[in-house]
Amino acid sequence: MRQLEGYLSITPIAIDDTRDLREQVDQLSPGDIALFGTDRLGVPLEYLYIALNPRDDYAEGRRNSINEVGFYDATSYCSGVPLTTQPWAIKPYLTPRAALKDIDTMRDINSLEHPQAIRTFEPRGIIRLENREVAVITDFIQGVRSCDSLIDEYRGETILPEEKARLIARTAFATMHYFHSLEKPYTMNDAQIKNFAFTISTEPWCIDTETFKQTNKDSAKITRFVRDVGSCAYSMSGQYNYDGQRMLSPELIIEYFINQYEESISDLYSYGTVDIVQASIEGLKQDIARGA
């Protein structure tokens, strides 16, 4: 996101009606920031300008995101007077279509009413970059940490402390179970542990929804859900320290992730697909037990 570092100040544009963003995004010029809503801080947007100050330190706990997500302090000014500073995460997308799809996904996730709801970052606006790519602005929330960054902290050790390993496995299970159990379920489609996260209070948090897809559970598509489980288990199993030793034991992955998911199969899937999922999970469990 180094494209934004040269911007000393940007006068934002308002997008009032966000129900159909495609046409409005197409009209943006390179360098435009479009914020969702017509008013910020009681001041019309045309009287504001925004200065972006890079904050790479915000990437702490999100090591794998720093190459694609930029972190900034966005300070709003009116007539040269600073009004407020907000931490932003700004993520570029290859196409406007991908950006708009992800905005819809984030909004849908955050709108769900559920006793175990897992939230994600709230989209606040769009930036048209100089290369014509589109970037999405979201709130940045300190204290959210990706599971792989926790592993990085201990790569110099022989094995990940058991309580940390359990936290990773439980976070992955809780997140996956939640999205697979919804009335209109989501598959993650990139269920590596770098895409699982937790808050400072160790509650699951969703950090990357770009590959999420709402999918029904008919027999033709059931493998997409099973693939999520396998991707996550193999990702946990494939974490090694600097000496080449496995950091999460197969026994722990099976007990705190695979077995937990297996016990919920009858609740997640219909009678006609339970056997398919069960057989796949049994095969996965055998693979992980062998050290795959």
Each PLM stretch: what is its role?
Residues R2-D57:
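Juxta-kinase regulatory segment immediately upstream of eukaryotic protein kinase catalytic domains
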Residues G42-R107:
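ATP-binding glycine-rich loop module of kinase domains
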Residues W88, R119, V136, T187, ...:
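Protein kinase-like catalytic core scaffold
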Residues T105-I118:
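Structural motif at the C-terminus of the N-lobe alphaC helix and the adjacent alphaC-beta4 loop
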Residues I118-I168:
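Conserved structural core of kinase catalytic domains
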Residues H180-I193, F198:
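Catalytic-loop of the protein kinase fold
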Residues P204-G291:
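C-lobe/activation-segment region of protein kinase-like
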